[in-house]
Curated annotation (Swiss-Prot):
Organism: Streptomyces coelicolor (strain ATCC BAA-471 / A3(2) / M145)
Residues annotated as binding dimethylallyl phosphate: 174, 190
Positions annotated to bind FMN: 9-11, 35, 144
Reaction catalysis annotation: dimethylallyl phosphate + FMNH2 = prenylated FMNH2 + phosphate
UniProt superkingdom: Bacteria
Keyword hit for Nucleotide-binding: no
EC number: 2.5.1.129
InterPro entries: Flavin_trans-like, Flavoprotein, UbiX-like
Function field: Flavin prenyltransferase that catalyzes the synthesis of the prenylated FMN cofactor (prenyl-FMN) for 4-hydroxy-3-polyprenylbenzoic acid decarboxylase UbiD. The prenyltransferase is metal-independent and links a dimethylallyl moiety from dimethylallyl monophosphate (DMAP) to the flavin N5 and C6 atoms of FMN.
Protein's recorded name: Flavin prenyltransferase UbiX
Designated gene of the protein: ubiX
């Protein structure tokens, strides 16, 4: 069964790329939903246009770049990815009878959070998230906005009460980050932790003052 990965319009497309790379590296299959707003963000942050007609090519180009926009070493094999148009409300993930392991929304904008919390289902991303909740599957929401007002905080509490895991895109610094990608990978790793997916994206805290930094 696949994981659904939804990409909303918040800044933070490198987080989505890191999660996708890790899922594929772990041998997971992915159903990808890229919202209209996120395509504008992706273009602004990476210069990549994500087009439905050429999504495999565009996804390979996206995943082959690091957070700094430079070429990465990732072998962008996207054979494990199935793309669904965000406007296709008849797509598989719109139904509870379509089997999935759960859904990761990364990054999640406040508009996306509100839509899911209120059950609006304005597009496939929101509909798939609502289905994930009603089917009691794992939903991880990586909210990437600051500051957060009372309305958004209440929406996040609603999602938590409904069974979602809310993972703010807030990197930690104890892992000895030296590059932007290290910070991105930490957040992506925490998203995957919440989903129960194994990975090696960051060094974990060991319970001493040395933290997760390498020794020797």
């Amino acid at each position: 069964m696949p994981w659904i990965v939804g990409v909303s319009g918040a800044s933070g497309t490198p987080y989505a790329a890191a999660v996708l790379r890790a899922l594929l590296a772990a041998g997971e299959s992915v159903d990808l939903v890229v919202s209209r707003a996120s395509r504008l963000t992706l273009l602004d942050e990476t210069g990549i246009s994500f087009r439905d007609a050429h999504w495999r090519h565009d996804l390979r180009e996206w995943l082959a770049r690091g957070a700094d926009g430079k070429p990465d070493t990732f072998d962008a094999d996207v054979s494990g990815v199935r793309h669904w148009s965000a406007g296709d409300l008849a797509a598989g993930p719109s139904s509870g009878s379509y089997p999935t392991k759960g859904m990761l929304i990364v990054p999640a904008s406040t508009a996306c959070v509100a839509g899911v919390a209120l059950g609006l289902s304005k597009d496939l991303l929101q509909r798939a998230a609502s289905v994930t909740l009603k089917e009691r599957r794992r939903l991880v929401v990586a909210v990437r906005e600051t500051p957060l007002d009372g309305r958004t905080l209440r929406h996040l509490v609603t999602l938590d009460d409904a069974g979602a895991s809310v993972v703010p895109a807030s990197p930690a610094f104890y892992a000895g980050a030296t590059h932007i990608q290290d910070l991105v990978d930490f957040v992506a790793g925490r998203v995957l932790d919440a989903a129960g997916v194994g990975h090696g994206l960051y060094r974990r805290w060991r319970g001493d003052l040395g933290g997760a930094r390498p020794t020797g």
